[in-house]
């Protein structure tokens, strides 16, 4: 079989992942969008069919990939058959840390027989996440570092700009969503 290396994800789970990694499946919509920025040609599936509004922003190969659904959690719509037919080497979950994720991801990994990792991808972890993806995806180190540098600059710029805003200038906004979104 393929050579594997031990990888410790953001939850502290150590997972054996392929050393040469070129076939990845996103666990959901956040992972789909982020992975499309670093290695769209390595993606073997998407979580959902992109909307026509998203078409022009996405790498064209994503538009024809099979959809596997949201892979776990209360809103799980995993299409196991589709996922298994994609021949993914690794399932990547990106986003915010949630309760019981370790158990959820271990259970998913056991169910599908494919290694599953989680990387925290909120604003504070974006730089680290891109560097990590760059280091595990074959030939993607330079792209990962480029995206990580961009993420770091953006966060620094936002922090600098928000520090310049006085209390009087600060805008107060409440964002809510109703039953229909």
PLM regions and their residue ranges:
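A short, structured surface patch at a secondary-structure boundary
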Residues: 31-86, 90-97
């Amino acid at each position: 079989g393929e050579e594997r290396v031990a990888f410790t994800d953001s939850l502290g789970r150590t997972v054996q992942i392929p050393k040469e990694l070129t076939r990845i499946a996103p666990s959901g919509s956040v992972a789909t969008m982020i992975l499309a920025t670093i290695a769209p040609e390595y993606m073997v599936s998407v979580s959902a069919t992109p909307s026509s509004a998203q078409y022009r922003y996405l790498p064209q190969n994503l538009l024809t990939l099979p959809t596997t659904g949201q892979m776990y959690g209360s809103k799980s719509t995993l299409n196991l058959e589709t996922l298994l037919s994609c021949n993914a080497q690794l399932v990547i979950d990106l986003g915010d840390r949630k309760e019981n994720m370790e158990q959820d991801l271990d259970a998913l990994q056991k169910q599908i027989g494919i290694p599953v990792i989680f990387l925290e991808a909120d604003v504070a972890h974006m730089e680290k996440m891109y560097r990590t993806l760059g280091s595990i995806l074959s030939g993607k180190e330079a792209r990962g570092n480029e995206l990580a540098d961009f993420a770091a600059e953006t966060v620094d710029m936002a922090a600098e700009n928000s520090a310049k805003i006085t209390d009087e200038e600060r805008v107060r906004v409440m964002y809510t969503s109703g039953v229909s979104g």
